[in-house]
Amino acid sequence: MHANVHSDRNEWRLPPDDTLQVGESKTKKSEVGDEEELALHEDEGHNWWSIIFSLLVIGLVISGIVAAIFIVGYVDELLYWHGQRMQLEELLEGDLTPRRLPSSWLSSKHFVFQSDDGSLSILDTSKNFSVTVLVTNNTLRQLNVKGYQCSKDLSYVLFQHNLKSVFRQSFTAHYTIYDVSKDHHIPVRLEASPKAQPERLQYVTWLGDTTSLLIVFNNDIYHRKSPTDESDTRITFTGQPDIIYNGIPDWLYQEDILQSPEALWSSYDGTHLLYATFNDSQVGTMNFPWFQFNAGSVLGSAGAYQRAPSFPSSRTLRYPTPGTPIPSVQLWIVDISNITSLEYHLVQPPKALLDLDYYLTSAGWVGHKNTQVSVVWINRAQNLSIISACLAPNWTCIETHTERARDQSWLEIQEHPVFSPDGDSYLLLAAVQEGSRETYTHIKHVTVTQQRIAVLSHGRHEVSKILFWDTVSHFIYYLASEENRPGQRHLYVVRDPSTDDPRRVESYCITCDLGDVLWSSRYLYRNCTHFSAQVSPRFDESSSPFYVLHCEGPGLPLAAMHNASSHTLLKILYDTRPSKWPLLEKYAMPKKKSLEVPLPQGSRAQVQLLLPPSWREELRDAAYPVLVEVNGRPGSKSVTEEFQVDWGTYMSSHCDVVYIKLDVRGARGQTDRSIYHQIGGIEVQDQVTVLEHLLEKHKYLDKTRVGIWGWGYGGYVTAMVLGLGNQQKVYKCGISVSPIADWLFYNAAFTERIMGLPNENYKGYVEADATQRARNIPKRSFFLIHGMADLTAPYQHGVMLASALTEARVLYRYQSYADEGHQLEGVIEHVYNSMQNFFEECLNLDTDEKAKEREEKRDEDK
């Protein structure tokens, strides 16, 4: 009996001639039986040889595949790897990330921006959107310009160059005025300064819409009448280094309150100046060592060894910690229309704050009449914020609006309110409850005279910025995320509550659906989900409204101008794709994937995965090492669709890892009640919960090779996660860079906002102390990195954590850098190389040698 395959139905059937005969004679039956038996044996022998031969061929093929995998390393690389691995030097050179000077509207007609050829250009909407060069690329490159300000008449451009960092947001710099018509440079220096060399100044800006200058030097403010004038008028006289600051913030205010290098605001016509004075005389002092190491002091000019100073000197900083005195602040208005006879007026804080500690969060002029300023104050606990309106001539202030935090929460510091021209109403950002538990940042409209408050934006998404209030057309333009897509950012418009139209009109997203409003430009923005925008100022019917739309990702950045009424594309201003895509194209780049993971109490973590270039959905049995970057700082956001090429991109490309970023409870757009008065609890546990979910659901993640790292607050979270000890089985090792260890020694403004005062929440401070968990960190699993001149998270934190680890006999790796601040800018290549080396050993990552061998083998196979 034979078996064969039916070609049509793919079934086994009996041949038609294999039938059973009955009633034949014995002789005939015997003869026929012998013949059939002989034929059957011959066929069976032939089939067995065929089967054996087929098995040998299959075995050889399988052996070849196994050998290829063993020799080359990864079968997926042979099949799918395109481009070369990114090198760290290529990342740090900065050529892969587009950099551009900021752009701005100078008037309703003129928009200044840096074009693709590097020049500073100006677009004129009144001249058929023509673009002319204001400053050539050559001029900008000669000075290595890092910032600029144009005078309103476009006759001068103020350059900022040769920046030297002081604090995180503040710096000293050289300032140069460029005369546009004469193509001439005018260095900015004070009258008494030497003329032979440029002078480092703390801040320089134009005085309102004039060509007069405001200069801040040694914590005092000076006035210069014109760019060509060499004489100055001193406006303040109280400045003291490290103690009293006029017109610029002290360390705490630039770090966590104003987050800006300046604290002065000039009136529209330049006749009045509003400025803040910060007094740190009662603030405690922090000391840190200063070695003054440089290549010359150690190696000498010819490379020969020279002895460094035997002992380091020390530097000091006024650094307020929780429960200790904070800086006092005063707000002043000075009339500088008569520069020879200055009049000063002190702006008083609200009565509710007079006998309490408080912060100044923002200030500014209202309208163009120089008769009103607005000020936003917040109490020390940061659960009560008051907006004041101060009126000329005595500048007496009245309270116009109060915001109070919900129970078990705090108030986030927001941008300054946007006022109507008459000052009778304004817009502000505030937390608004959506649903039973969740709150989101939305726009409130406050009418001062009628004491009416209306919420203008709604929904389960975050408003991040109010762009412009067009009081002529009664439209408000703002930026916000899209519901269920918090990593995106879009341009929205909503009507204000005008008297002509009392109906409530829902906000409308301009960029969410490119097939709708932006139909004509949908192909230009097809790889854009993260936008910013700049709307032209408009104060009467004579000017047409326009907006410049900036695509910031996930594709390469570009920008174009649109008509605000029809949304028609008018002109492309810059497009980085032609210049940057050829550079990126040669690299094996990771793929970005975003998803949500459920958390307790109905919350959902936002997760972003950078999948390595060799990853494919069909490779279900591949197991990739995992590296998680944590931030965790309350109010921060890590998961975004903005274009980025950072160390995570490099690690995914170079070391074939799945790189993960998380936003858990406490992040912007997430509930903050769960971490109020208990830092280091829920947001730390969420890091474990999310990874357990991902490892269970996605089989391509290697459960045995998971690392974690973070910087600053993220470094603190990393130490706390590893400090869970046996309570977590997810993370094998981690790196804390410039971490916070004990919240009693972090800055008062941030810490008290969430934790309260130590005498009111002592238990919370103890439980949040990372040094208390040091004994639970597994040996050889922790790498601590810190700069000894770190002002954000002082070096004391690293020392305390290291001491706790040592006392607990935990073996760990420790690296410190002399004279380096929080960002470790001067040694960043060494830092990244050290981090990569640690994870290569801990997670058994691809080393450069292994990668080189595989790439050489792949080239040979081609």
Language-model regions, residue ranges each:
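Beta-propeller folds
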Residues: H2-H530, S536-R538, P545-F546, G555, ...
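Serine-hydrolase catalytic core recognition
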Residues: S362, T499-D501, C509-L514, L518-K862
